[in-house]
Amino acid sequence: MTDASYLSPAKINLFLHITSKRADGYHNLQTLFQLLDFCDEIRFSLRDDGQINRIKGNEDIVAEDDLLIKSARALKKYSNSSLGVDISIDKKIPAGGGLGGGSSNAATVLLALNELWQLNLDRQTLADIGLTLGADVPVFVFGRSAWAQGIGEILEPINLPQYYYLVVSINKHISTAEIFSHKALTMTPVQRKIADFSRLSDLHNDCLDAAISLQNEIKQALKHLDSTANHLDNARMTGTGCCVFVAFEKEKDALVAKKQLPEQWFGFVAQAINTSPA
């Protein structure tokens, strides 16, 4: 039996512009994915009987719906590997907060089992498999902070400043489907180029108004972060919510701000990274 452990990082969207709605119901977007050094840890024990089992995970999700299992089964189906695996996860990334935890977990499973099952598939193939599981999976498969277009799968790696981020969860959840079907969802139809975002200050998240209308506490969290000392820019929401974040140049300032959070919220400080540890 082979045992191995892999990290699965969180991400934030430094901005998220919805450019159009597609005929298939998905939305085209432009965004900057920033990876963080705040990670789940996933452990793998290989099996020679072909079975895929979840030993430890989110008990609120049945195993068949868990991206840990779905990604392993998708890879097994594609590769026809005779091997199996037992999977366990130690979760740190808040679920359903726009931090990409589930997508990151799926990507880490694909990357890990590609190695452990000795499949030798390239990352583009793994990303194509990942895209069938979720639009954010490919960015974690390629493992780079990136400028993204399409539904999030057209990626251009980019090196971003390695700031420290205070990320706050209000411990509430909004489904992505609720956001994208909400009447308050805004759009930014003008296509921008990646160079524009080095000089424009109008970075925003088109999902914010819809999210606030569903969970007004997001607005309170943004206001609180904007009141902290020594932060670099306006606080923003990541993904479709509900987590919000603000950047600091110095870790100590982020840690001071974390101590000032209301006790009903969960917060963590993480540094931006441009390459995934997965």
Give the predicted meaning of each segment.
Residues M1-G96, E115, L119-Q124, I151, ...:
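ATP-binding N-lobe of GHMP and related small-molecule kinases
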Residues K91, G97, G101, K250:
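Active-site acidic-Proline motif in GNAT/NAT acetyltransferases
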Residues D48-I61, V109, L131, D196-H204:
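Short, basic/glycine-rich phosphate-binding loops at helix/coil junctions
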Residues G241-V244:
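Conserved glycine-rich beta-strand-loop-beta hairpin in the small C-terminal domain of fold type I
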Residues T2-S8, N13-T31, L119-N234, A247-A278:
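ATP-dependent small-molecule kinase catalytic core of the GHMP/sugar-kinase superfamily
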Residues G97-R123, V139:
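DPxDG-like acidic metal-binding loop motif
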Residues R73, T108-N114, D128-L131:
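A broadly conserved amphipathic alpha-helix scaffold signal in soluble, globular proteins
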